[in-house]
Amino acid sequence: MTVSVDDLCVTRGGVPILSGVSFDLAEGAALILQGPNGSGKTTLLRTLAGLQPPLAGQISGTEDRIAYAAHSDGLKSMLSVAENLRFWAAVFGRSDIAPALQAFDLHDLADRLAGTLSAGQKRRLGLARLLVTGRPVWMLDEPTVSLDKRAVEMFAAAVEAHLATGGSALIATHIDLGLRDAQVLDVGPLRASPTALAGASDEAFL
């Protein structure tokens, strides 16, 4: 199922940040969000993931299909690596964590408490959770933060494998992940203009 976004307006702190956002994300496709810091990429991802409502526009194809990885890894520090993955697998009604351990080279760390991991190891564990959700649409906010070159390659390989099985990915990143056939959406030109701000504010109070 294609994720479709039509004429979306998103807000931060009640202020419109982006307007006129439209795109389709098909099965097996990746879309890279680009733009300077503060341009609205995180706000757009949070809106698409259902963490905040849009001010205007339509989103379809996301219902119970999204796995979202934010800046924070959100790990349970007193659980081991394997226990963290089992916890999140259970949340999504699943149990197999072996592919996640393998994809992010976490086998040797499986019994380590998450709180004792390095920043890069924590990030790998946070990203590995995507594989245990079973969700077909991945949305990721700067997923390569704290990762070294080898770990970035692991992540890119995991995304490619996900796309090959019909999954899709929407990724905000400043680096080239080398994903084949990935499209790019620059949010810079979609910054809400003063006219859009006024119109959106009026509509919000109708």
Curated annotation (Swiss-Prot):
Matches recorded under Gene3D superfamilies: P-loop containing nucleotide triphosphate hydrolases
Taxonomic superkingdom: Bacteria
Principal subcellular localization: membrane
GO BP, one annotated term: cytochrome complex assembly
A cellular-component GO term for this protein: plasma membrane
Chain ranges of the ABC transporter domain: 3-206
Keywords: ATP-binding, Cell inner membrane, Cell membrane, Cytochrome c-type biogenesis, Membrane, Nucleotide-binding, Translocase, Transport
GO terms assigned for molecular function: ABC-type heme transporter activity; ATP binding; ATP hydrolysis activity
Residues annotated for ATP binding in this entry: 35-42
Catalytic activity: heme b(in) + ATP + H2O = heme b(out) + ADP + phosphate + H(+)
Enzyme class at the top of the EC tree: translocase
Listed InterPro entries: AAA+_ATPase, ABC_transporter-like_ATP-bd, ABC_transporter-like_CS, ABC_transptr_haem_export_CcmA, P-loop_NTPase
Subcellular location: Cell inner membrane
EC number: 7.6.2.5
Topology class, membrane: Peripheral membrane protein
UniProt cross-references to PANTHER family, sorted A to Z: ABC TRANSPORTER I FAMILY MEMBER 1 (PTHR43499:SF1)
Family named by the database record: Belongs to the ABC transporter superfamily. CcmA exporter (TC 3.A.1.107) family.
Its biological purpose: Part of the ABC transporter complex CcmAB involved in the biogenesis of c-type cytochromes; once thought to export heme, this seems not to be the case, but its exact role is uncertain. Responsible for energy coupling to the transport system.
Subunit structure and binding partners: The complex is composed of two ATP-binding proteins (CcmA) and two transmembrane proteins (CcmB).
The protein, known as: Cytochrome c biogenesis ATP-binding export protein CcmA
Biological source species: Roseobacter denitrificans (strain ATCC 33942 / OCh 114) (Erythrobacter sp. (strain OCh 114))
